[in-house]
Amino acid sequence: MPIQQLPLMKGVGKDFRNADYIDYLPVNMLATPKEILNSSGYLRSFPGIAKRSDVNGVSRGVEYNMAQSAVYRVCGGKLYKGESEVGDVAGSGRVSMAHGRTSQAVGVNGQLVEYRYDGTVKTVSNWPADSGFTQYELGSVRDITRLRGRYAWSKDGTDSWFITDLEDESHPDRYSAQYRAESQPDGIIGIGTWRDFIVCFGSSTIEYFSLTGATTVGAALYVAQPSLMVQKGIAGTYCKTPFADSYAFISNPATGAPSVYIIGSGQVSPIASASIEKILRSYTADELADGVMESLRFDAHELLIIHLPRHVLVYDASSSTNGPQWCALKTGLYDDVYRAIDFIYEGNQITCGDKLESVTGKLQFDISSQYDKQQEHLLFTPLFKADNARVFDLEVESSTGVAQYADRLFLSATTDGINYGREQMIEQNEPFVYDKRVLWKRVGRIRKNVGFKLRVITKSPVTLSGCQIRIE
């Protein structure tokens, strides 16, 4: 009687709307490529969230400030250094952040506001008219960054970007402050730095600018590097993030159906699977523009997290050697969007903001709950052929014993890849029982095809691997 191994890293089913085959992504579970008990890897629940502190509002942005060796976070109408307030921030939308030796800058409400470490607050503006220096049409700030000794910001709705003065950061450079990304006539959507380049992200191109080294008064300090230009654009200001020594971004619909790419040496590499592109395609251009991307690293996982209005998707570079490995995160027992955002390593823990409440949290690896609420974890197997066969002993390896009370695993089967039947409850965790078997002894007769879904609702961490069945 043959025993068949079933992979859990990615299930396969059908879309009932168009009968296409789709991937069923793991939900709240991360794949770990490590040889465990005849399996090439195992799946581990995403770390839970515990409350850390009350703050002024929902999270709007975060940055690690190297000059102060502290995390600066904008929550509601306040700027926080660690857990202490250091300033007021106007507005309620997402903000851009950068920092230098003397100040922490926040791009908010069309202004570049500098919160100096001596307690004063300055807003970037033109030099006094009687100074004799050039007066610029600064317009509205869209995105900010910093390279070497200067802040740089993009002017909303134009292809212009500016740099601050070396001596006084609250004014533009006195001689050569304004530059243009001329391949982006519809405007610079976002700006960033990579190595020693200023990177301007448009809707159809990504341009790089490098220092010229000029010291002559009035000479251009930055010049475009056309050899590094990329013929893709980004969907929104925050649809980009440094990742894997480069940038990852969601492409703009102006260059075709949106996807997720990583930039490398003047060209882009797609990392999205067909199912991820289907999800991105379900959003309008305006909805995609509201997306936020961030990167996170822990326990050898290199994660790219994409926050969309109705989905939170996670790409794991460390598990993607045999093809892109994605999973989904969610909050609650239904399809509510994942609530945590703005992850950053702080002290010896990973802290995060919140999309729903005025709190900050911290990731805990010994739980899978979110603010003491149980979470649902889903895994799927691919459809496989078992023509007129009897199936016994569906077994999953589970690392057990750490639960506070007996947890159950819900198993259900599908024969068409769309509808899953009645769930079978199996105890899968129990306090101090470290070798508990998760076994469904009699599955039944299969007419043609079959696939399985595993569902766990718990506060405890979940570790599953090695799904197998016996076929007669």
Regions inferred by a protein language model and the residue ranges of each:
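Acidic surface patches and DE-rich sequence motifs
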Residues: 65, 116, 155-156, 202, ...
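Hydrophobic or amphipathic alpha-helical targeting/insertion segments
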Residues: 98-131
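Generic structural signal marking isolated hydrophobic packing positions
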Residues: 104-105, 151, 206, 394
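Residues that form or flank phosphate/diphosphate-binding pockets in enzymes
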Residues: 107, 201, 389
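Short beta-strand segments and strand-loop junctions that repeat across beta-rich extracellular domains
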Residues: 113-117, 154-172, 206, 312-320, ...
